[in-house]
């Protein structure tokens, strides 16, 4: 038996191994064949296999070989279609997944932003609270010093406010009682208001604060802010006391001389005049403070003060013009004093058993409203001081404002 050379035996062994690998790969790839549109029904398989290649010297080396089992046309169509379709499908899937990721992350990002903003605001409030907590002792110390410096003004302000609240409550109660009001109580309120005003001006007589009641400047030096506030506050309260005293004088007038209905219109007119007066009486004081003749060191400061004073006057005129309609309506009601109905006949009074539904007593000067309900003139006038409808059927009788007809005085301070 003739022995073959060693290199031939090696090539034969490698050839057998290559054939076995080829068969295995062909069997495994037979289930992955694809039918391409536009090609024949026969499947096409394209494989890349490692095969040995013989060199010129007769040695075998590993390489790649492609085995085509279909026709060239089908093979070319399958390859071109696979090249065209697969990248497109990948890109579309990539875009689709990217879009879904954005859609899914959008609400989460918005929620995260909202939560961050909320946490930042809470953190700012917390830091402010901590700062306030640490600064509270210092604030308390300086506040105590400020109170001690202005203890006189604070005490006078509390006293004036207490006097006003007491007198206003007493006047409203006496107006509500009508014929049963206490003349002695009204006289006491009048004396109390007069004595309080005189005592205040006597205590601070060196400042001549009463000059401001007649739109003149008090005898003070250069006005600072708290000085102007002191003068305006006292003048405002004293002006209210003056008009409250006039209301007490009207209360002392007997009802047969002036009816309660007429008194209500007088109270309303006095209150409108009081508000206008208190709004105007502070103008000279603030005008002097803004110009401040005594502390002008240069022409620029003086011109700046003049500009501020002019702006203040313009704003004051705008406020007066805005209240012009309300004041004119109140003045018209005071001059005309309209009636709510006509005098009722005896037959109309007998239909309701001759008794007023408000006071539950016999009629005194009965009047019939447009809704044909009968009441006492004084009773229905007192009712319409706060209401605009009939007390029985709620029919609108008067659309006009009847504010301040109960004798009350506004607590609003006309500081500026």
UniProtKB/Swiss-Prot annotation:
- Biased composition (Basic residues) is annotated at 77-86
Q: What is its main location?
A: endoplasmic reticulum
What is the species listed in this Swiss-Prot or TrEMBL entry? Xenopus tropicalis
- What stretches pass through the bilayer? 146-166, 184-204, 214-234, 237-257, 265-287, 302-322
Region feature Required for ubiquitin ligase activity and for protection against ER stress-induced cell death, mapped onto this chain: 349-400
Superkingdom per UniProt: Eukaryota
What GO biological process terms does the UniProt entry carry, in alphabetical order?
positive regulation of ERAD pathway; protein ubiquitination
The EC number(s) given in the record are 2.3.2.27
* S-S bonds: none
Q: Where in the cell is it found?
A: Endoplasmic reticulum membrane
Q: Which membrane topology term applies here? A: Multi-pass membrane protein
Pfam families in alphabetical order: zf-RING_2
| Top enzyme category | transferase
- Please write the reaction equations for the catalytic activity of this protein: S-ubiquitinyl-[E2 ubiquitin-conjugating enzyme]-L-cysteine + [acceptor protein]-L-lysine = [E2 ubiquitin-conjugating enzyme]-L-cysteine + N(6)-ubiquitinyl-[acceptor protein]-L-lysine
- List the protein's name: E3 ubiquitin-protein ligase RNFT1
Q: Does the keyword Zinc apply?
A: yes
Q: Does the keyword Membrane apply?
A: yes
Protein role: E3 ubiquitin-protein ligase that acts in the endoplasmic reticulum (ER)-associated degradation (ERAD) pathway, which targets misfolded proteins that accumulate in the endoplasmic reticulum (ER) for ubiquitination and subsequent proteasome-mediated degradation. Protects cells from ER stress-induced apoptosis.
- Show the PROSITE patterns listed in the entry: ZF_RING_1 (PS00518), ZF_RING_2 (PS50089)
Q: Where is the composition biased (Polar residues)?
A: 27-45
User: GO: which molecular function terms?
Assistant: ubiquitin protein ligase activity; zinc ion binding
Q: Where are the zinc fingers (RING-type)?
A: 356-394
UniProt pathway:
Protein modification; protein ubiquitination
In residue numbers, the region (Disordered) covers: 27-50, 63-116
Which SUPFAM superfamilies does this UniProt record tie to the protein? RING/U-box
- Please provide one cellular component term from the Gene Ontology annotations of this protein: endoplasmic reticulum membrane
